């Protein structure tokens, strides 16, 4: 009696396993270093960072000193990120450029872990273009900014006033063009520089 090999379906769970291991490593590294990193909470000065945008240009938070800045840490494979991005774009269209900036920091691997279709090899630029995003998209594949801000999940967002102080921190997705967020941003924009 001979045993015939079962034909492969071509589907593998390996990409998902790699993604889970990567996320677990990021969380583990953040947990191990938590005593060495000062807490980032409402009322503290936002840590400065520098990271490349999608065209390779260097962007620093300090380049936006005197502006109100929304720093959003996200990934292409994150469903709540996908859901909140359109509201960020609407907010940016209404008040972006008048002393208000959004810096969306992707923690995706070089090519992105998953595309919009759920397949491996998602592209950050493709993601942003498919949603019509016009605010700056930054790329931090090492997760350094996530660690620096002690973010524990994606999306995690920090609203920073003209004085460099964190005024709001949101873990999870939200509707950024909702009145309570717009009112706070308008108050921060009205504050002296």
Regions found by a protein language model. Name each.
Residues 1-50:
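N-terminal targeting signals for export/organelle localization
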Residues 70-72, 104-106, 159:
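Hydrophobic beta-strand core positions in alpha/beta domains
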Residues 61-82:
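Short active-site neighborhood of thiol/selenol oxidoreductases, capturing the structured segment around
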Residues 83-131, 141-147, 183:
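Structural microenvironment flanking redox-active thiols in thiol-disulfide oxidoreductases
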Residues 127-135, 139-188:
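Thiol/disulfide oxidoreductase modules built on the thioredoxin-like
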Residues 46-47, 69, 154-156:
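Short loop/turn microsegments at loop-to-beta-strand junctions
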């Amino acid at each position: 009696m001979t045993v015939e090999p079962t034909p492969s379906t071509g589907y593998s769970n390996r990409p998902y396993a790699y993604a889970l291991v990567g996320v677990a490593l990021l969380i583990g590294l953040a947990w191990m270093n938590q005593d060495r990193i000062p807490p980032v909470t409402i009322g503290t000065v936002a840590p400065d960072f520098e990271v490349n945008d999608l065209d390779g240009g260097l962007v620093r938070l300090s380049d936006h000193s005197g502006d109100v800045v929304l720093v959003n840490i996200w990934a292409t494979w994150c469903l709540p990120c996908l859901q909140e991005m359109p509201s960020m774009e609407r907010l940016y269209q209404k008040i972006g450029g008048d002393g208000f900036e959004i810096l969306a920091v992707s923690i995706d691997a070089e090519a992105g872990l998953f595309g919009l279709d759920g397949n491996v090899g998602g592209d950050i630029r493709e993601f942003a273009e498919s949603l019509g995003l016009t605010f700056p998209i930054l790329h931090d594949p090492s997760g350094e900014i996530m660690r620096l801000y002690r973010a524990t999940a994606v999306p995690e967002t920090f609203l920073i006033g003209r004085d460099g102080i964190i005024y709001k921190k949101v873990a999870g997705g939200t509707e950024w063009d909702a009145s309570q967020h717009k009112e706070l941003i308008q108050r921060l924009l009205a504050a002296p520089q």
